[in-house]
Design a protein with these regions (language model features):
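Sec-dependent N-terminal signal peptides
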Residues: 3-15
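Extended soluble regions of mature proteins
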Residues: 19-276
Length: 276
């Protein structure tokens, strides 16, 4: 029997068909020229249903206008009707496609949520890292500390991992907190993954740990911490003390009574062929 199916079955047994899991995450970014950008992501997961909504608030006027203004965008996967909906809450518009249409497109959704076009940071740095010489990479210094004790973070007992990377480009400081209490997290991830798989697609996973990804790219050996990340901070500073700061934090994850309206589009929204 497929191991993944067994795990998901156990999760479903523990989480009643009369309930759903609601997750709220907040990300804050402060970068040169861009300024402050805050993103709130809310996820809803129940048997056969998954919804994700992202609200972006950009502080600087010119950057906000260049991005098309502050946004509130989302998508809904409905396993019972086999449909996928994307919507723009600000414009009160939505578009819909069936799973059959996606299957005919090799498992790739045709309708795109405009949220996917917004790169919330980090891309330019990857390019700079790829352009570094081998000599510069060898000069980098790495320091990683894993706390023995646990801290209480967002209602979870979590272990803190601190990673410092010092190079000719400056200093990168990453702090991450991991919990091994992962039942609700796994349920949300499996619901989304199974719905995506049902139309022949493959769910894109966010990196489990940003520090581990960077250490792997640098071919450094490191000790991994098990569990689910519930918070991280990342700061980058160059020799001029100019820098980039990003904070991501789980605000809440709860099992609540099932609410059908959480997986339905608002009646006031207008149906369109695709979002602008």
């Amino acid at each position: 029997m497929n191991y993944r199916f067994v795990v998901f079955f156990c999760l479903v047994v523990n989480i009643s068909a009369q309930t759903q899991v609601v997750v709220q995450e907040v990300m804050f970014m402060d970068a040169p020229y861009v300024g402050e950008v805050s993103t709130t992501i809310t996820k809803y997961a129940a048997n056969n249903y998954f919804r994700q909504e992202s609200e972006v608030d950009v502080d600087r006027f010119l950057i906000r206008m260049a991005m098309g203004g502050n946004k509130k965008l989302g998508s809904i996967l409905d396993g019972k009707s086999e449909s996928r909906i994307v919507y723009n809450a600000k414009d009160e518009e939505y578009a819909m496609e069936t799973f059959d249409v996606i299957r005919e497109n090799d498992g790739n959704p045709i309708l795109k949520s405009t949220m996917g076009r917004m790169n919330m940071g980090g891309g330019s740095r990857e390019g700079r890292e790829n352009n570094n010489s081998d000599e510069e990479e060898e000069e980098s210094e790495y320091d990683r500390t894993i706390s023995e004790s646990k801290e209480r973070v967002v209602g979870f007992d979590a272990r803190k991992v601190t990673t410092k990377i010092k190079s000719n480009d400056g200093l990168v400081l990453i702090e991450e907190w991991f919990t091994t209490d992962t039942t609700l997290f796994h349920f949300v991830a499996e619901v989304e993954a199974d719905l995506v798989a049902s139309y022949g697609g493959q769910k894109r996973n966010n990196p489990r740990s940003f520090s581990e990804r960077m250490l792997k790219q640098a071919e450094q050996e490191f000790e991994s911490v098990p569990g689910q990340m519930v918070k991280y901070t990342m700061e980058m500073k160059d020799e001029d003390d100019d820098g980039f700061k990003m904070v991501w934090e789980l605000k809440s994850i709860t099992e609540v009574p099932y609410k059908a309206s959480d997986f339905e589009i608002y009646n006031s929204f207008k149906k369109v062929d695709e979002l602008d």
